Amino acid sequence: MMEAFPWLEFCLPPCPEPAQERSYEYIESISSPRILTFHGWPHLTPQGLPNTKYILLLRNPKDVAVSMYHHLRGKKSISYQNNWNDFFELYLSGQVHYGSWFDFHLHWEKFLSSRQQVLYLTYEELKKNIKTCLSQLAAFLEIKVSAEVIDKVAIGSKLEEMKKNDKADCNWMRTNQNEAPHLRKGIVGDWRNYFTEEQNQRFNDLYIKKMSGSKFKDYWDESILGITRED
């Protein structure tokens, strides 16, 4: 996966194995147009490139919490050992990788507001209408593709298919076979199996407070996020 779409953050120290060759010089050597993946804050992205196109993929922050919890438990360089309740407190207070989900997305929203070429996608929409999203993506990138190619990519993007691909599954990140793999469930709404009623209410209160002025606030309906929209 990283060979096709290098992770830009691996240019930043410390550079984890087996990505030592993913240096800044390596990224610079890739001819344009190039596709780079990035999980970090916007101020760390390459600047002064006016033709850059940005694709921001968002996911329900409650599912993000559960996914991050399992990801950190299985990652070699971290191997988080505490339970879900402890992790929830860290997540809610922003004491996790990349900091507060709220601040992270508010910074990206502000950063992208001054950019002309931006495509917003949600994980939930990808799960629901993958072919439509792929068509939008191809149009945004100005890539002409046939319906057959869209069908093939849609099939290859299914979690069951990606798990068969060692490069996509990123097994090198795992600590041991007892932990969750890099590609775990990939479902929408798994947070309901983890959040207690009290945790859910606390998160909802903070979400409404922090995201009140954001256009991302209503990206997910009540059935997904579990927060009633205000008309």
What are these regions (language model features)?
Residues 151-164, 171-172:
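Active-site/pore-lining binding-face segments in mid-to-C-terminal subdomains
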Residues 121-145, 153, 161, 204:
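PAPS/PAP-binding and catalytic site of the sulfotransferase fold
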